[in-house]
Curated annotation (Swiss-Prot):
Quaternary organization: Directly interacts with SKP1 and CUL1.
Role this protein plays: Substrate-recognition component of the SCF (SKP1-CUL1-F-box protein)-type E3 ubiquitin ligase complex.
Pfam family membership, one: F-box-like
Residue stretches making up the F-box domain: 77-117
Protein name: F-box only protein 15
One term under GO cellular component: cytosol
CDD domains: F-box_FBXO15
InterPro entries: F-box-like_dom_sf, F-box_dom
Keyword Transcription regulation recorded: no
Origin species: Homo sapiens (Human)
Length: 510
């Protein structure tokens, strides 16, 4: 049988050489499967190490004729021979081959091929997975019943286990926690090792979608800033929503491959309504663009003249970032596991032992990086359903803090760049008395003149406020511009924590 197949393959190969004429080079093919592909150059190349079944343009009519010749040759091959070729491909190449045509898709689902890949990757001898005796017996029985499984069963099993192995590795690397921030120590390392990226999906009102991978990112102390820009944005007037998704390679080492067409799964982080780009959400502008803040943490830049998208910027806090970027699906965000309340042994004393870390930054420049420990408030300090936690007291000059440098939010596109005054990114990490993250967020903010005079107006200088609000709390910052030193001075910083959040967290009834 093997000899007969070899002669058939040899005849097909000789026939192909006759049709295409003398070879123009290309060298010997790597691996046994190369013997059945087209030569290096114009046409189609099948190889064990190739990331996809792809066409290499040679230019003009010659490429078209070469491609149609090779394509016709492959389509005319018996399924038995194609299956033999596919059996030499690795998992990545086999998955990409299945995208070429409907026939290739069905052939690339062959259970005998995939069970070989599965058993090689996850055999007890080689895998990091620990199999008990029952699992080993179940696996052996599954191997014996390959023919009884529907087509593609073992492909799905392989991909499912690959994803599970990535998730298990992520959970393991995120276990160590920094006692000062309450966040995983190796978040930055996890982002690098697993090739985690982000994409936005712009959806038109008619249903058409545009997927854009991030162009640039910067990793901060407790957050990551992700940026999208380019020349080919869809018309803003036709867009309805924007989905922010995390992207993770199914195969952990494949993200190093330079090709753009990689196999990844998407995890929905947040969905935004682009009809909310109104005057109420605009936080700043310069001579070229206007910027809008959409909750949570999204900044959208729009050209003033054309009223079209200029860039999108997302600021993502490290708290549960890896889980939210990997463990959700393309349509459903990751849900945090149910919270078990930390029993408060002294509710009559209110909140105590809290710690706050706050950053104000933009473009890698930090205007404020402060940590405040041993924060407390009395139980009776409640206003409008919120517990008031004072971090910087207005009347205590020793607590007042200056901002470093001139505050501004840096932006760039592939053509222009700029800086919008009085805007920046704010990262807040609040830890409870047990050192657990109680409230975390990252969001664009801006300095605004207060609508009504406040107590800080007694200071020499113009006063400004920075305010942030979400379902879990509110941040209020008062600043004074000191003209002599040309710097902002924080004279008041107050957190307002939702009573509903506190009761849920501690099982109390404030």
């Amino acid at each position: 049988m093997a000899t007969g197949r070899g002669r058939i393959l040899q005849q097909h190969w000789l026939g192909l050489q006759t049709l295409r004429g003398p070879s123009r080079g290309g060298g010997a093919a790597r691996g046994r499967a190369r013997a059945f592909g087209c030569r290096k150059g114009p046409g189609v190349k099948l190889s064990a190490g190739s990331a996809a079944l792809r066409c290499h343009a040679g230019g003009g009519q010659h490429w078209e004729s070469s491609f149609s010749c090779c394509s016709g040759f492959l389509d005319g091959m018996p399924s038995e021979i194609l299956l033999k070729i596919f059996s030499y491909l690795d998992a990545v190449s086999l998955l990409c081959t299945g995208c070429v045509s409907r026939r290739f898709y069905h052939l690339a689902n062959d259970n005998f091929i995939w069970i070989g890949i599965y058993s090689t990757a996850f055999s007890p001898a080689r895998s990091n997975w620990k199999f008990n005796s029952v699992e080993k017996i179940a696996m052996s029985m599954s191997f014996l019943s390959v023919q009884d499984k529907e087509a593609g069963y073992w492909k799905k099993e392989y991909i499912t286990k690959q994803i599970a192995s990535v998730k298990a590795a992520l959970a393991d690397i995120l276990k160590p926690v920094n006692p000062y921030t309450g966040l995983p120590v190796k978040t930055k390392e996890a982002l690098r090792i697993f090739g985690l990226g982000w994409a936005i999906i712009l959806k038109e009102k008619g249903g058409k979608e545009y997927i854009m991978e991030h162009v640039d990112l910067s990793i901060n102390d407790t957050s990551v800033t992700v940026i999208w820009y380019g020349k080919k944005w869809p018309c803003l007037a036709s867009l309805s929503t924007l989905d922010l998704c995390g992207m993770t390679p199914v195969f952990t080492d494949w993200y190093k491959t330079p090709t753009k067409h990689r196999l990844r799964w998407h995890s929905l982080i947040a969905k935004y309504n682009l009809s909310h780009l109104t005057i109420s959400t605009m936080i700043g502008c310069d001579r070229l663009i206007r910027i809008f803040c959409l909750h949570p943490g999204l900044l959208v830049g729009v050209w003033k003249k054309e009223e079209e998208l200029a860039f999108v910027m997302a600021n993502l806090h490290f708290h549960h970032l890896v889980e939210r970027s990997t463990l959700g699906s393309a349509t459903i965000p990751y849900e945090l596991p149910p919270h078990s309340p930390f029993l408060d042994d002294s509710p009559e004393y209110g909140l105590h032992g809290y710690q706050l870390h706050v950053d104000l930054h933009s473009g890698g420049v930090f205007y404020l990086c402060g940590t405040f420990r041993n924060l407390f408030t009395k139980r009776g300090n409640i206003e409008n359903g919120h517990v008031k936690l004072i971090v910087i007291h207005l009347k205590n000059n020793r607590e007042h803090l200056p901002l470093i440098g001139k505050v501004g939010l840096s932006w760039k596109t592939d053509i222009f760049d700029g800086c919008i005054k009085s805007c920046s990114m704010m990262d807040v990490t609040l830890l409870d008395e047990h050192g657990k993250p109680f409230w975390c967020f990252s969001s664009p903010v801006c300095l605004r003149s207060p609508a009504t005079p406040s107590d800080s107006s007694s200071f020499l200088g113009q006063t400004y406020n920075v305010d942030y609000v979400d379902a879990e709390g509110r941040v209020h910052v008062e600043l004074v511009w000191i003209r002599e030193t040309e710097e902002y001075l924080i004279v008041n910083l107050v957190l307002y924590l939702s009573i509903a959040k506190i009761n849920h967290w501690f099982g109390t009834e404030y």
